A protein has these predicted regions:
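N-terminal pre-Walker A segment at the start of P-loop NTPase domains
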Residues: 2-24
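Post-Walker A helix-loop "phosphate-sensing" segment adjacent to the P-loop in P-loop NTPases
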Residues: 54-65, 79
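Conserved nucleotide-sensing/catalytic segment adjacent to the nucleotide-binding pocket
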Residues: 66-115
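Phosphate-binding P-loop
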Residues: 26-32
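Conserved lysine of the Walker
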Residues: 45
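Hydrophobic anchor at the beta1->P-loop junction of P-loop NTPases
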Residues: 35-37
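P-loop (Walker A) phosphate-binding loop of NTP-binding proteins
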Residues: 40
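Short phosphate-coordinating micro-motif centered on Lys-Gly-acidic
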Residues: 6, 104-172
Length: 172
């Protein structure tokens, strides 16, 4: 049974807000942490992932583009600490391809960011940060982020979401 520990909806987020949420999250991520990013094409999933990875690039004074793994499925970054793996399952067509990727090994050795996690089917991890991007181009291009902690026990992650909620509520 999957336990939803905590959740919150951040409404009307622009790209600067999304980047700030990603930057704050980057400060607490450790090997074994998994982020599942859901949402339609163009909602900001890749942008969010790049913002997180870029924060670590800055720490290590790495100045290079962060490509989307849309065609390669996986992009790893083992030149930073913690090591990152960015997975984009959009183009994956068969569940048998998941076995070839070796996600269990990736989960144990990297901070893992997965776009289009719906394609994981029954292979979803037991614990993860679920971030759903809700994008409405018909209403002033509004973007909402729904963040849920699924099976998470990390006090740092709970504190991150609690602090984020508090700061957000003070702004509205």
């Amino acid at each position: 049974m999957t336990l939803i520990s905590e959740k919150f909806l951040f409404k009307n987020q622009n790209s600067s807000d999304v980047a700030l949420i990603a930057q704050r999250l980057s400060k607490i991520l450790e090997i074994g942490d998994i982020l599942l990013l859901k949402g339609p094409v163009g909602a900001g999933k890749s942008f969010f992932a790049r913002c997180i990875i870029n924060e670590f690039f800055k720490k290590f004074k790495i100045y290079e583009d962060i490509p989307s793994p849309s065609f390669s499925l996986i992009q790893t970054y083992d030149n930073i600490k913690p090591k990152f793996c960015h997975v984009d399952l959009y183009r994956m067509s068969f569940s048998s391809e998941l076995e070839e990727i070796g996600l269990d090994n990736i989960y144990e050795n990297f901070v893992t960011i997965i776009e289009w996690p719906e394609r994981l089917g029954t292979k979803k991890p037991n614990r993860y940060i679920n971030i759903k991007f809700i994008y409405d181009k018909n209403v002033n291009y509004e973007r909402h982020l729904k963040i849920s902690l699924i099976g998470i026990e990390s006090k740092k992650i709970f504190k991150w979401l609690k602090d984020l909620k508090k700061d957000y509520e003070e702004l509205i």
